[in-house]
Each structure stands twice: as C-alpha cells, then as structure tokens.
Amino acid sequence: MARIKKAVIPAAGFGTRFLPVTKATPKEMLPIVDKPTIQYIVEEALASGIEEILIISGHAKRAIEDHFDSAPVLERELEEKGKDDLLAIVRETADINVHYIRQKKMRGLGDAILCAKSFMAGEPFAVLLGDDVVYADATKGQQPALRQLIDIYDAYGGSVLGCQQVVPEKVSSYGIVAGKEIAGSKLLKVSDMIEKPELSEAPSNIAVLGRYIISPTIFELLEHTAPGKGGEVQLTDALKQLALVEPVWAYCFEGKRYDVGDKLGFLKATVEFALRRPDLGGPFRSFLEELMK
C-alpha cells in the first residue's frame, strides 16, 4: 500500500466573509496571534509525516508564496543585530518543500482538487482545508488530526474522511455522512454523503471537517462530476461516487477544531491559542478577567 507523502491545501478562494481585509490580503495569511492561519495547516501536515505540499493558489495570493520563501534582506538584518531567535523563526518557514498551482476559475472545491492531478502522479494523497484549524492536545496524547487519518489509512486502506459530530443547527453547513459503524464508534464505512443538507434530510450529524486521505481514483470521478450545489464542482459528490467503487471511511478524529473561515470562529481560535502560549497566557487571561468584571 502506497505511503501518504503528499498533501494539497486549497487556498484560491476570495475570502469574502472577511472583506474588506481580504481585498488585498489572502484570508490564509490572517494571523492567529503571530502566525498566519495557513502556517498552522502546513505545520500539521509536516507533523503528520507529509513530505511535499501543493498549495492551490489564486488571484492576489502572492503573499502566501513569499511567506514560505527565503527573505535574504530580513535575514541579514536579524543576523547583524544578533536576533537569533527571530532569525530561526523566519528561516523555518523557508525550509518547507512547498509547490504552487493556480486555480484559474473558482469552480468549487472539487475543481481545486482536480488541479492537483498531475502533482499527485497516481498516488493517494492528503487534503487539508484552510478554514479548519485543529488543536491537538499533546498532554492528552492526541496526535495531529491528519496523522490520525493516515493511521486509519495504513490500517484499512481506501480513502478516509476526517469527521466530528456537530450540533443540529450546524448540519446544513457541512458535508454529512452516513455509514456502518466499524471497530467502535469513531470509524464508519461510508455508504452515503450529502453536501449541506437541511436537517430533515441529513442522514446523521457526522460532518466532514476539512481533513481527507483520498485515493487517486477521485480525479477520474471529478472529471465527470457535474456542478452541484451552488453551481460548483463539489468534492462531496465525487466522494459519494468513490464510495460505490472503493472503501471510503469516516473517522471521528480527536482534537479541538476551529472554523477560522467564520469571524466568530476565528476570534475564538485567536483567544484560545493566545491563552495556551507560555509567554502570553497569564497576562492575557488576567486582561480578560478584568475586562469581564
């Protein structure tokens, strides 16, 4: 069975929910404390054993490429001033093996994944969506979310969808799966999927939340997938077809997931990540407590 070595991160969207800041700044570069959102995603991929990353880019996304590139002038300035700690931070993002391709038309997530076909070269691969940041608590023995999916792939093969249960009022915001429970309550063999169903039409409350291991068979299916909900090529529609010909698993991963594509979710992530920081947590908590009096 092929090892999962490559990952794709779709990052071509306009980020309209965060206008006006996203008019000139990629949504993926908005910082959670002092680190761009997309860096958290890339770091999860690397911590999960991924060796090569393809970012599906788009118009006005050059800042992403610059962030993961070397910065000779800045590095020289930091080196001359003896700021070795900051120099190390700047250089660590430049050493990551990142590739880029443009999605020329915004035709949905399925079309964005299809842009990665030649890069994947017939191999199974990972997908990480930039709107989903997952905090894995190492003190509780939690592995990165993508690593958990790779472990399921290594054990069962096929494709693996990263899922969690969502509250009823959120069902219509996600792709929802149905299936037969396997090996305990955290793993299902998928029999059906519906993209953003009404609650009355949802087969469960188990939602796909931005992490995937996908068989290369998906590319042929995407090439023949007609635009679906919203007039876009839906990855969910192709995965539903994939489940008819190959095993597709839904795994409820451990970790706290933040919807950073939503303003409130982004604020929650910023606050909680700041509170976990050894250098910021104490003073910031004191500030919040004083603020809430």
What label would you give each PLM region?
Residues A2-E80, V98, K140, P144:
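N-terminal glycine-rich phosphate-binding loop and ensuing alpha1 helix
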Residues K6, E51-I53, N97, P124, ...:
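Residues at the starts of beta-strands that form the adenosine-phosphate
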Residues I9, I55, V127, L161-G162, ...:
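Structural beta-sheet core signal
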Residues A12, G58, G130, Q164, ...:
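Cofactor-binding loop segments of dinucleotide-utilizing enzymes, especially the Rossmann-like FAD-
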Residues M29, V98-Y100, S159, V248-A250, ...:
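Conserved beta-strand scaffold positions in the cores of enzyme catalytic domains, especially
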Residues T37-Y40, D111-C115, A238:
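Well-ordered alpha-helical segments embedded in enzymatic catalytic cores
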Residues L74-E77, D84-G179, E223:
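Conserved beta-loop-beta/alpha segment of the NTase-like Rossmann-fold superfamily
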